[in-house]
């Protein structure tokens, strides 16, 4: 409860909209390997759960996207390997987005104490890494990190910028536009959104590894640089 990384709405309404989401934009068509949250009809779909892992695989218009999620034993992180394959006879220009919405740590307080919570969100971006460090400076010794193992073309860290002020994960504004806006969260609802453009020849595939991790430092070692 006190160290939740991603936001969860406890009444689960709307149903099954939260989580680590992968979006594929192929021309004007936007879809997810796991169908949710865009609910775009897929040509084929499978979901497999094993001991410590889940594999989602969807196919749309000749493109197959496979999402493999697991938590390594002994490590405080989730790894998400996404493999996109062009099974069509034409070159595909695709935009891939990986998205999570951060919880402000206390899972119960996160959905109730709005007069305070909406002023605490804080992030830092370095290359392909988004650090969620809400309250790290003030009173916490832990933070979260969301990253990709390759250069990204754009990013967002505010929900309003990625989803749109009146939008949501079912039809994100940034995905429809084909790129993120480079937003930096200062309060409100911090998120992690990473965008990568792919050009795939017929028969070509490409894999990207995304990670979501939790890091905790000893309280006395929070700041180790001189003068900080």
Annotate each language-model stretch with its function:
Residues 1-228:
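Anionic coordination/interaction segments
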